[in-house]
Each structure stands twice: as C-alpha cells, then as structure tokens.
C-alpha cells in the first residue's frame, strides 16, 4: 500500500474521531454528522464482501461487523452479501469495490479458491484486504494483510479430544460436513482427523456434506443411520444447524440422542447451547462470531501503516455438560 492511501484512510478515521470528541464536549449533535465548520466529516470507506444468509452464526458475525463499522465510529461500511452463496457475485462485488477506490476491503469468502486474481487487483490498486473468518487457497499471505478468525483446526481438535475421552471404547461415527471447497471445512476435517487418525477403536462409517443446513443434516443422518442399521455411536456435525438436524433424525430412528448416539457440534449458537442443556447434544465447541472490534482495530492499525501478523486468532470456548450450557444461556448473545 502506498503512503498516500494509508494517510488518506488514517486521516479519515482521525478526523471522524476528533469530530465526535468535539461534538461530545460541546453537547452537539450526533457524532459523524458534521465537522465543526458545518462540513461533512470524511469517513473511511470499507467494502465488506460478505457471505450473507447462512445460519445463525453468519447472521451474528455479519451483524456484529455492521454494528461496529458505523458512521459514528468514522466509517462508511458498504455491505455486499453473496447472492445465494455464489462466488461469482462475491468476485463482482470485490471488483466493484476496487474500482470505486474504497479504503479497505473485508473479505469473507464463500469458497477458498479462485481469489488470486482479485487479490492481485486490489494489491495493484493499493487497497488492503483483511480476511474475515474464512481463509483462501492457496494461502498466499502476501496478497492480504491478515486473517481474523477463531482457529478451526484447534476447535475441531477439541471436539475430537473430547470424544476420545468421553467414549474410551470408541465405536462407529459419521461426519456431517459443510459445503465442499470451503476452507473452513478442510480445516475442521484436518483438526478432527489429526486426533482420530490414531484411534483404532473408532471406525468412520460415513461422511457427507449437509451444507450447514438443519434439514440436510437430518436427511443425511437418516440415510447414514439406515445404511449402518442404526449402529452409529457418535456424530460430529461441523456446525450447529446440521447437528440440530441430526438430533431429529436420531430421535425418529427410535434412538436417544445423548445416550444411544452422542452428537457434537461447532459454533456455539444459542439453539445448540439450549440443546446441550436439554441433553440432546453432548458437546458444543464455540466458534466465536463476535470479533468486530478486533477487525476494527486491525483496520486502524493497517491504515496507520502498522505491520500485523498474518493471522489473528479469535478466542473461543467449549461447553461439555448440560450444567455448563445452562450457566451460559442467560448471557448468550447469538
């Protein structure tokens, strides 16, 4: 990024911040509306190439970004959700942001591959790109500033570690995966498999995408239960919605979730935590979506010319019992 681009964005943030401070001190109007001499404040323009509707986790994450990058904070956030999770619509939005000369692009990709040309275009235009949640493949770190996300590999390892400890005798298990080609899916498989690969007491009897959806999680689980004559002891659902669908399938098969079949999920949405409190899920690994403030800090530091690490990990927690779930529910934000 050139000095001029950095300075332009930094001055915009600083100008808006000083204006807000001045208005607060004087008891003036809403921050972000005007400067002290009556002119409009210069806002830092952020192009957010987003995933769009994809379940409770995504809704919470993208709303958190929009609630953080406000005009009052000195930003003009241009929100561009994908059309039906279509990568082409994202690439078109990304290109439009580059052409319009936004100050920073936040990218949450529907698919990991296919971004090299777009990222090079932004680099040539001196527009910094920050990855939100999902990574890119190949992971060419020179093409973006940083990636901000919980650690998918470690989160999935946590699920596997819990399963090995909770069920020392092992058994048959299946995996409900997200859409093929998404980096998150590959990372979660990598983390989970790194633990289960050395566990001879466990046998993988099925793995199929259910596209992050409850209804597909149910139908895929139904199919795999029938194929294995209900002889499945553990289900790893790579997100909460698929796990909630698996609960329905297990119950309709005449089995008891949590007793006959243990189900573990990733995300930590309120519905999943409630299902754990109700003994229908056995383990929920949080994948914290609320990192708007971390992204805001990264944007400010980037525009100030500071060097950031290639990856900024968002801390997350786990829930391993109904008691832990019940304690968390009153303050659950998503």
Name what the model sees in each region.
Residues 45-72, 78-94, 102, 108-112, ...:
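Extracytoplasmic "Venus flytrap"
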Residues 107-124, 192, 206, 210-274:
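Hydrophobic alpha-helical
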Residues 117-154, 172, 269-275, 322, ...:
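Flexible loop/hinge segments that line or gate small-molecule binding clefts
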Residues 15, 27, 42-44, 176, ...:
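Hinge/cleft segment of the Venus flytrap/periplasmic-binding protein
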Residues 23-38:
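Bacterial lipoprotein signal-peptidase II cleavage site
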Residues 84-85, 89-137, 146-150, 240-244:
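Beta-alpha junction/loop-to-helix N-cap segments that form part of ligand/metal-binding clefts
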Residues 79, 138-162, 175-177, 207, ...:
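Short beta-strand elements at the ligand-binding edges of bilobed clamshell
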Residues 46, 90, 147-173, 216-218, ...:
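Hydrophobic alpha-helical segments within soluble ligand-binding/sensing domains
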């Amino acid at each position: 990024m050139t000095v001029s681009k950095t300075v332009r964005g930094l001055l915009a943030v600083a100008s808006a911040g000083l204006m807000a401070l001045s208005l607060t001190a004087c008891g003036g109007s809403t921050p972000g509306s005007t400067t002290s001499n009556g002119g409009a404040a210069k806002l830092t323009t952020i192009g957010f190439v987003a995933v769009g509707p994809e379940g409770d986790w995504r809704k919470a994450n993208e709303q958190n970004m929009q609630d953080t990058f406000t005009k009052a904070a000195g930003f003009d956030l241009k929100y561009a959700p994908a059309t039906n999770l279509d990568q082409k619509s994202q690439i078109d939005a990304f290109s439009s942001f580059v052409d319009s000369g936004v100050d920073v692009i936040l990218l949450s990709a529907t698919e990991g591959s296919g971004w090299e040309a777009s990222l090079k275009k932004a680099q040539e235009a001196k527009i910094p790109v920050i990855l939100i949640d999902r990574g890119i493949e190949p992971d060419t770190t020179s093409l973006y500033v940083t990636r901000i996300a919980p650690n998918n590999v470690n989160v999935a390892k946590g699920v596997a570690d819990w399963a090995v400890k909770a069920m020392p005798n092992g058994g048959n298990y299946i995996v409900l995966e997200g859409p093929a080609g998404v980096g998150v899916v590959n990372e979660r498989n990598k983390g989970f498999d790194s633990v289960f690969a050395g566990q001879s007491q466990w046998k993988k009897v099925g793995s199929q995408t259910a596209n992050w959806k409850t209804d597909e999680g149910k139908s895929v689980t139904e199919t795999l239960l029938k194929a294995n004559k209900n002889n499945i002891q553990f289900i790893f659902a790579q997100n909460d919605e698929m796990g909630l669908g698996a609960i329905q399938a297990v119950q309709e098969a005449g089995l008891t979730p949590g007793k006959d079949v243990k189900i573990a999920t990733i995300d930590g949405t309120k519905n999943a935590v409630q299902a754990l409190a109700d003994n229908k899920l056995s383990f929920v690994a949080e994948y914290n979506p609320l990192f708007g403030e971390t992204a805001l800090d990264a944007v400010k530091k980037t525009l100030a010319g500071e060097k950031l690490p290639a990856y900024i990990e968002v801390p997350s927690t786990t829930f391993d019992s109904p008691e832990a779930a019940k304690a968390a529910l009153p303050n659950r934000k998503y």
